[in-house]
A protein has these predicted regions:
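Ordered hydrophobic segments in well-structured contexts
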Residues: 19, 44, 55-57
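Acidic-basic catalytic patches of nuclease active cores, encompassing PD-(D/E)XK
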Residues: 1-37, 50
Length: 177
């Protein structure tokens, strides 16, 4: 587990107005502003759809050099420990019988369409409701950071400084003509 990766994920959810509780690499998230009628995100959740989630248990997997192929998922069953096991009791207490999503934050899915489909199938079979990739999550956090605002969080402050000095490429404007 990388504490830096967990902190980035915490800040992403906090920037999107979630309440966040942490227990090592497991986060419990609650979005009191979520509307039931807004729908739900797909399995691969883009950062701009994260606010559709009301409650969630999030496991941060910071194996940044790996893509989550079927082989990786099958060789590492501990990835799915948070779905069952000792966390069940904590989840029931935290969400008081309300529905919640089981979400993995992972570096990447396979590039190959067949491997991607197989990986998603395995994760669904193991009880995962959605995944967020680190590139999407980090881009979403950077979008929320204001270059001229000071942040108490060291993660956000580092991102703010990098954004201020234009280390991140601005999105290209698309003109209507």
């Amino acid at each position: 587990m990388s504490q830096a990766s967990v902190e980035i994920v915490k800040e992403f959810f906090a920037a999107n107005r979630f309440f966040v509780l942490g227990d090592e690499d497991i986060l419990f998230i609650r979005n009191s502003l979520a509307r039931e009628s807004a729908g739900s995100p797909g399995f691969v959740i883009p950062s701009d759809e994260i606010t559709l989630i009301k409650n969630g248990v999030v496991k941060v997997i910071s194996w940044h050099t790996m893509k989550f192929t079927p082989a990786v998922l099958n060789k590492n069953p501990e990835i799915f420990d948070f779905v069952a096991g000792s966390y069940r009791h904590i989840v029931k207490k935290t969400f008081m019988e309300e529905n919640f999503s089981r979400i993995l934050v992972i570096p990447a899915l396979p590039s190959s369409e067949n491997l991607r489909i197989d990986s998603i199938k395995i994760m669904k079979e193991k009880g995962i409701d959605g995944v967020i990739t680190f590139p999407s999550l980090i881009a979403g956090l950077i979008d929320k950071i204001e270059a001229r605002q000071v942040y108490l969080s060291s993660v956000n402050e580092v991102l703010r400084i990098l954004k201020f000095y234009r280390f991140f490429v601005e999105k290209e404007q698309i003109l209507p003509f």
